[in-house]
Amino acid sequence: MWKFSECGKGYSGVAIAEGKIYTAGDFGDHEYVLALDLDGKLLWKSPNGQAWHGASPGSRTTPTYNEGRLYHMNPHGRLAALDAATGNEIWAVDLKERFNAQFGVWALAENVVVEGNKVLCLPGGPKGRVVALDKRTGQTLWVNTEVQDTAAYCSPTVVTHAGRRQLITMTQKLVLGVDVETGKLLWSAPFVPKSPQNALTPVYRDGYVFVACGHSTGGTLFRIDQAAGTARVVWHRQDLDNCHGGALLIDGKLFGCGCRMGGRNFYCVDFLTGRSIKLDKSLGKVGITAADGMIYALNHRGTMSLVALTPDGFEVVSQFELKKKPDNTYLAHPVVCGGRLYLRCENDLFAFDLRAKPTSP
C-alpha cells in the first residue's frame, strides 16, 4: 500500500488508535514521537529527550495510547505524556532524576502500561524500582523499593490474579508481581539469565507465568504461590530461549522462537507441560503477533511468514521478503490492525493490505 521512510533510527513498533499511527525514532541527537495518518503521511513530530547513541543505537519503545494521550519513555528514562492529536507535550518526568533509574547496557526498553489513572513503569532505581505515576499530571502515586534489582528490557503485563490486579514483569534477575493499587510486592522468584537480557513480556494464564531469556538461558513456567510470596518452577526448557521475539498463548499452546539453543526453532509446546507439539527451523529468528486465527512472524533479516494454526501445531502458509538486512535488524514486532499489516525496520514503515485479492494472471 505504502512505505514511509522518515521514521528515524530505532526499533520502536507502531501503535494505532483513532485513525492514526504512532511510532518513535531518533534523528541526530534527539528522539521523536511521530504520528501518521492511515495513508502514511506525517501529521506531527514531537521531541522526547536525547537520542540513544550507546549499544544498538536508536529508539526502543512504542508509544502507549490512552484516552487521547500518548505515553512514551525514551532510552534514558524521560517519560512524557503527549496530546495524541497535536503532539504537544503535557508533562514529562526524568526517571533518573526522580527515582535514580538504573538499567543495563541497552538502556530502558519498556513500553509503559496505563491502568486506570496510573502509568506503570519500572525505573529499577533505589528510589523507585517499580512506580505508578498519575496519568494526568505525572505526579508520583506510589513507589516500590522492596524489589532489590535493576530494570531489564521487557514490557510488563497487567492481570487479575487471586482477586487483585497486579503488574507482572521481569527485572535483571527476578520475575515478580506488584499490586497495581498499592505498589506492594506480592510475590517474586529468581530468574537469573546466563546473559542479562530479560526482554520477553511474561505470559500469564490461571496462576501460571511463562518467562524466558535468550542466549541459552531458556524458558521457564512458574506457578504463583502468592500466600508464600513466591512462584515455583513447573518446568524449564533450555531450548525455548526466547530473546526479543515475544511469545503467544493460544488455546493452551505456547508459541515462540528460540535464540541460540535448538537452532532458533519456531516452537509450539503445551503450556502446562512444556511438551513439544511442533518445531520448525525454517522461519529463522522471528518476532510474532496473532490476528484472525493466524500468526504473523517477521524474522530478523526481513522474511515475513504467515503461519496457520493447526491441530498439530502450525503450518507455514506463505512468505515474502523485505529488503535483506543483517541479523537483529528487523526487531519491531509485526502489527495487524484494520485489515492491514504494519512492519517497521529502522527508518522505514511498510503498510500492506491483507484484504487485497490476488491479481489474476
Regions from the PLM with identified roles:
Residues 1-361:
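Noncatalytic, solvent-exposed loop/strand surfaces
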